[in-house]
Amino acid sequence: MRDSDIGIWWVDAFTDRAGGGNPAAVCALSKPLAPAVMQAVAAELGLSETAFVEPPGSEGVRPLRWFTPSVEVDLCGHATLAAAHVLADASSSVRFATRSGEVAVARLGERGLELDFPAATVGEEPSGEAGLAELAGALGETPVWAGRGGPDVLVELPSAAAVAEC
């Protein structure tokens, strides 16, 4: 890989001062890289997330992927914000194609960015009462409702106090 194939930025998201906020690396690629190479770069950089942005396709949408030092993740808000900060000029918008769907970013004024993430689909946990009983045993509290959003189980508990006790 030549030096010109990748530009790397360290961006502190959600702050206006260096060293604050939530850091992410942004790698602007001149061509796609193999996932193993992206994983190795993310591991070497050592931040919680590294965003890899490819050049835009024919419709202007840029492929975007996120890697932790050990695994690729489906979505990362602060690294998306960091990538948009690196790529969006004062008057532009950016669209990213991700494993979670398309993310649109619009410039708001001189320093603001608005991110529009795809809505996650959540369905009720199909295992019904048996599933709720199993969750109650694991949590020490009976859930009001449980559902799935992708590989994640979402649980509604009866109160904030019940959440604090878990």
Residue map of PLM features:
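Active-site proximal loop and beta-alpha junction motif in alpha/beta enzyme cores
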Residues: 1-75, 79-166
